[in-house]
Amino acid sequence: MKDFVNQYDTGHITDRLYVHWDVSTQCQFKCTYCYAMKEYNWESNDAPGDWNKIDSWDRQKLVIGAISRSSLPIFLGLQGGEPTIHPKYDMLISKCHEAISKHEEGRLYVTTNGLRGPAFFESKPYYDKLMFLWSFHTEYADRYGNGS
């Protein structure tokens, strides 16, 4: 238990800003327990409401610009939906990495369902500088491992 408590001891941490950004509601899955589907008014397969949408790239660049102007180090988390199917994923990662790198303590992470597989991630910009959070979806367990 002591190791667990030490892991979350915040006495050494400088002030920072945590940003959890739903960059898209697009996803390869439609999990029955997905908070985002409910939050973005998913109604049915035929009437998706705001589900499976993405803001314009110009609007997203404005968000990234605002993040880059922070006077505090940023911990920026890209989530959704599934960020890796963003149509400009490589550019998104590059611009976000540039924005958080203004401060040495800045961090960028991607929350992913992991469906795309290791080769996808390893081929992307800043792979060695990103953190990945993987959420496994048991409803779609049969789709993992094919690298789609």
Stretches found by the model and what they are:
Residues 7-57:
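Canonical Radical SAM [4Fe-4S] cluster-binding loop centered on the CxxxCxxC motif
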Residues 61-77, 86-148:
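Radical SAM/AdoMet-radical enzyme domain recognition
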Residues 19, 77-79:
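Conserved Rossmann-like nucleotide-binding pocket used by diverse enzymes
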Residues 23, 80-81:
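Short acidic donor-binding/metal-coordinating loop in glycosyltransferase active sites
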Residues 39-55, 81-87, 137-148:
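Conserved non-cysteine loop/helix-boundary elements of the Radical SAM core domain that shape
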Residues 1-7:
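Membrane-proximal basic amphipathic "stem/tether" segments
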